[in-house]
Amino acid sequence: MPGSTSAGASRTPPLAWGALATIAVCLLYVVTLAPTTALWDASEYIAAARVLGLPHPPGNPLFVLIAHAFGTLPLPLSYAARINLLAALSSATAGGVWFILIDDILLKAGVATVRRRLCASGGVLLGASAFTVWNQSVVNEKVYTISLALFGLITLLMLQWLRSESSPRNDMRLVAIALLLGAGYCVHPAGLLPGPAVVIAVAYRDWRRFLQPRLIALVAGAFVLGLTPFAFEPIRAAQQPALNEGAPTGCEHGLAWSCTFSEKTYQRLADNVNRTQYAKPSVMDRQIGFGPQLGMWWLYFKWQWLRDSHGRHPFGQLVLALVVLGVGLYGGYAHWRWDRASWAYWAPFMFTVTVLLVYYMNFKYGFSQAPELGSAVPREVRDRDYFFLWSFSAWGVWVAVGIASLWRRFTAGAGLLALAVIPLAGNWSAASRRDDTVARDWGADILDSVEPYAVIVTMGDNDTFPLWYAQMVEGVRPDVTVIIEGYLDMDWPVHQLLEAPIHSYDSERGPAIYRGRTWVRPTRPALNMSLAESDSVPDYTEIREPQIFRSAAVEGRVQPGYLERKDIFVLRLITDAMPQRPIYFTAGSSYPAQFGLQRYMRTEGLVQHLMPTPVGDSSGESLDVDRSEALWRQYHGPAAIVRRGEWIDRASLVVPADYALLGIRLSDALDRDGKHGRANVVRDETIAVIRAAGMEELFGLPRK
């Protein structure tokens, strides 16, 4: 009861068994580990670790420091695989703690040792093989696996505090928890999620702890100490690393005392930590109803136990999810009956990482949710299941307790242990990233599509991260200047563009099609303006009448309306960079049409090249057949897509679609030129890409 210790307080937790569980889970992840980067944020975070840089706000400084140190270990793995291994170890650590927690709960219930270990093993396996947990643990796509490890350590400390006699020494575990909460916030703001559960559990056992000034001071001090990695951000930002998103510093020309401790640095750091640039609505300003938001969580919960990506087994997926949900809820009830002390922590924690987190994140409809509603509802740009991996991993604890309780009542309840094996078998092909090199190959393919010293304007950051990875981690084409069009609305990307070093082109490492020519290294940045001049560019300017845009190389037409800051910079880029630097746009960019430049555009592989003279009519750009065919032959992406097989993430389908569209266009052009044999080769390779990515319906092909 409150104010007392639990029976069995002197028992040492089964750390050896927890370690074995950690090793077993880690082996599963190592067998299915990604050999390199992946789509979405993985490339950004791996690159940030490599160059000791700053990823997108809030900057995740503790992750960067941990990953950078881990990446220096002399392991027989590529740099990316080492960072992926860090994700695997982190998730596996949480699995070991869940084993200890389950064993402890069942010991309180008087469950026999063998049965305890079987149920704990099943619960750990179930949580570890949940689709999102598994898929995120074999590549460092986010920082959430390190957060999961910290949640596990906090849980272990909390369990020990609840089980031990009251003493100042025992209370030091609360101080350690406060330190981990602060440090967890430096990994990701979600690091605070266990906080409410800790407070409730402490209040349950002995609310008088909140009246002890010394303990409160130690806890507060430890929490603040845990936040100190944020000091890394302005210090490192001032040194201008290759990856410096948000640039949270007032220092423009190197680290100095005066600019570091300035109002400008404070404001930029605060904006970075608070993610001000994303302008996320208040939690009180609901983007959609709470019901559909819970529906999104339920969709992702169903995915965990059988990731039926093509909808072939919807009924089986639903039944399995209902069983896992029901057994878990029953396990929560059994937990409450058997062990109120740990339940006082674990139940609030589970509520926080499920219901409360759903409400707080305030997402729009999920990318895959309610497809029948189409574009009639606001949607996230991708499925956000990764935000809930903590609840999916931890759900295995209550499922294990539920199985133990049912097994005690019914001998047949032992059969529920089979639940633990179903996700392992059903999710293997979907969760494994063992042969996935698509993101690395795609980034390198785009970079190798452009001429030396080119400038390439990309549409979004997620499309650009693989290019950053290729440049910063693998040294592919650092001579290319990569510009994200949306970032040009902010000052720091423009400043970095103006001050970026110009790397020499390495013809030996570059594509064969660019060899045998002399490429002159540019002498100035792609944008030829001062920092002050760039800061004076307005957020937008109104165009009342059609305007002719002329540079030394091209002539376009700007229609009436509003030019945003990014548009102004792109026009200035065309003026300043050409003809010294070739300019490219990624496929799908709206700028050629927006500025009336279609007749200057020539498709070369995966990119559009802005030529200095017209190469087509005003209806659209032309295709450089010879160069595109040469690029197609050197591209690694199509083979990687076929090798990967099932394309689970439909939100990133643009990647295989870009290859497929190029292949279709190229094969048709080769046919028109009478090169039917070469056309058939490209067409067959394109069809293989379409089928591997499951795009038959999109491209009008019958399913096999």
Task: Tell what function each PLM region has.
Residues 85-113, 125, 129, 153-157, ...:
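Transmembrane-helix motifs of polytopic, lipid-linked glycan transferases
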Residues 15-28, 121-126, 351-352:
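Alpha-helical transmembrane segments
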Residues 2, 109, 122, 138-143, ...:
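ER/secretory pathway lumenal C-terminal domains and tails of membrane proteins involved
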Residues 61, 73-96, 100, 117, ...:
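Loop-to-helix entry region of an early transmembrane alpha helix in multi-pass inner-membrane enzymes
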Residues 5-20, 115:
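N-terminal membrane topogenic signal
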Residues 26-36, 355-362:
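Alpha-helical transmembrane segments of multi-pass membrane proteins
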Residues 65, 101-104, 136, 157, ...:
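A residue-level signal for alpha-helical anchor/packing sites in multi-pass solute transporters
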Residues 33-45, 55-67, 261-262, 434-438:
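Extracytoplasmic catalytic/substrate-binding loops of multi-pass membrane glycan-assembly enzymes
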